[in-house]
């Protein structure tokens, strides 16, 4: 549909030392639902650019982002005035290398690591939840490969656990 609004998002993941894949989710600001970081592309920015910016601002995470979408899904976004608009979210894989202890939306959101099943159970969107469950068979999709872009953090930001 041409009246759909486009958003870019990330599915932030990492593989633990024991080989278990984990997904990072954040809460939505208004209703506190567990979601993936996503946002509107700014003028002249790509969907992957919007996705990486939102990962940094909404979740306080840095890492490597994949060049090709992992999944697209649709949902109805409730606007501040209560009206709803159809949105299509293009989700890129992100291998999380670090979490910031201070980030722009820290006071407005929670951020938590989940196993794939636990993440899927908490996600409202059925399509995205079903996709997250499939990652169990191919957790390597959460690892950066050739073509992934290393996201830089701004100077002055400190990663948790670093001095």
Predicted regions and their residues:
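N-terminal strand-loop-strand
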Residues: 1-36
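Short beta-strand micro-motifs in enzyme catalytic cores
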Residues: 6, 22, 85-92, 110
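Charged phosphate-binding loop/patch that engages nucleotide di/tri-phosphates or the phosphate backbone
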Residues: 123-163
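The catalytic Nudix box helix
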Residues: 36-70
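Active-site segment of metal-dependent pyrophosphate-handling enzymes
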Residues: 56, 60-100
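Polybasic/polar functional segments that serve as interface/processing modules
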Residues: 1-5, 45-49, 57, 72-76, ...
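NUDIX/MutT-family hydrolases
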Residues: 90-134
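Short aromatic/basic micro-patch
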Residues: 35, 86, 113
